[in-house]
């Protein structure tokens, strides 16, 4: 089901998306995924009790129209970083090696690509800590890491608004309002591919 969903987005809608959202939707619940082998990702449903908490996916009202190029730039730029390391995906790149060769990566792929890679490498490590927090029943730590991931996405992945349309930032505003409402008691972050659309609270 997930691969069919990815095909529909790639071919029918022309969006060069990966498989993460489709795998999460087809599996259901909280899901751990590892894409070290893109042809056979590891998918494990997490058994976490979250009493008193609700996951809300909020429509920010932002429009995705005309933003395919902004979205497509992410895998294209990350691909340039991967090629430098002889990797198919960033999950196959060791973080220490990436930072050791950072000047080379900047020359090969550009600063925005390097910042985006920093987000992905950080999120790969952050996911392990999120799973550990859930397994330990430490939901406060899990929420903190969700917010940390969201800030990394905004600052380094740069997928909350498109540089070609800075006047309209519905998702940025939605995230600011979510932080105002939930700070100290909840978590929030961009959801999906970004550039408008939804946030998860």
Provide a role label for each language-model segment.
Residues 1-22:
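Glycine-rich, mobile lid/loop segments that gate access to catalytic sites or pores
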Residues 12-13, 71, 195:
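Aromatic side chains
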Residues 24, 29-189, 201:
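C-terminal nucleotide
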Residues 196-200:
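N-terminal pre-core extensions flanking Radical SAM catalytic domains
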